[in-house]
Regions:
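Short amphipathic alpha-helical segments, especially helix-boundary/capping motifs
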Residues: 25, 84-85, 229
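Generic preference for well-ordered secondary structure
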Residues: 2, 28, 35, 95, ...
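Intrinsically disordered, low-complexity boundary segments flanking structured domains
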Residues: 1-8, 95-99, 170-174
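A generic structural signal for short, solvent-exposed coil/turn residues
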Residues: 10-12, 25, 101-103, 116, ...
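Pre-Walker A-like glycine/lysine-rich segment at the N-terminus of P-loop NTPase domains
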Residues: 1-73, 77
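Residue-level signal for well-ordered alpha-helical segments
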Residues: 10, 21, 28, 88-90, ...
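Electropositive, glycine-dotted interaction segments
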Residues: 108-249
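Conserved P-loop NTP-binding catalytic core
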Residues: 47-121
């Protein structure tokens, strides 16, 4: 569960922290936000939507490259590309849509969370075009530690996150190539989904696997203007994977 959100230069928020803890310092199971129109209620929900979008940019890259390379597949390719770009965005588009207009500083999103009593935080910071800082703190084995801390000049990934040296090296190499235009989490999730034998997933520590399941199972729906709505349904692949047939035990 989420414990707090910090947002800087995000939509209408120049600098805000939204606390989701109760009086006993535990995450609230239900939070209702109410108030007048235009005060930023939807922008808080948009932070979760934006987080989910940043996890998919590597998959978007593959999708667009495949479409561009196939010159004969579709007659209305430009219309399809326009549609895909509106639904599946690269990091620069995500920043452009969410960073406060005319803001001079960086945009920052920080999420505090609690998974099975273990607390952590995930930070994502951008300039006007790309990611410039990304960091995850969570329980490594018994104590809380830094999983990764990446900036434009530093690439620090804790080897304890992976059970296999080759996997660590493979992910680090991918980050050297793609990070900035894609987040570490997007790169890692793409590598996991790209391997049919699930090798990389098996080489991830249990606590990191718990975090990945938590962060990829966010579901939210937000409104754009008075008519348009968009949403993300975060479900494990085992759920609703086969639409043609199936059964639900009662």
């Amino acid at each position: 569960m989420f414990e707090y959100i910090k947002l800087k230069n995000f939509k209408s928020f120049s600098d805000i922290e939204f606390n989701m803890l109760d009086r006993r310092n535990n995450p609230k199971k239900l939070i209702l936000i109410y108030g007048e129109n235009g005060i930023g209620k939807s922008n808080i929900a948009s932070a979760f939507f934006t987080l989910s979008e940043t996890l998919r940019t590597m998959d978007v890259r593959d999708l667009m490259e495949a479409l561009i390379s196939d010159e004969t597949s579709l007659n209305n390719k430009e219309e399809l590309k326009k549609y895909l770009r509106s639904r599946y965005k690269d990091i620069e588009t995500i920043i452009k849509e969410n960073k406060t207009v005319s803001s001079e500083g960086t945009m920052l999103l920080e999420f505090g969370f609690n998974i099975n009593g273990k607390r952590g935080k995930y930070l994502l910071e951008t300039n006007n075009t790309q990611i410039i800082h990304e960091k995850l703190e969570f329980t490594l084995t018994k104590k809380r530690g830094v999983y990764f801390d990446i900036t434009e000049s530093k690439l620090s990934i804790n080897e304890k996150v992976f059970l296999d040296k080759n996997t660590y090296t493979e992910i680090k190499t991918a980050c050297l190539k793609f990070w900035g235009k894609h987040s570490f989490l997007s790169i890692l999730l793409h590598e996991i989904n790209d391997k049919s034998d699930k090798y990389i997933r098996d080489q991830i520590s249990d606590n990191f696997d718990s975090f990945l399941k938590f962060i990829t199972r966010i579901s939210c729906k937000i409104k754009f203007g008075s008519r348009q709505e968009r949403g993300i349904l975060g479900l494990p692949k085992e759920v609703l994977a086969e639409y043609e047939s199936g059964s639900i035990p009662v």
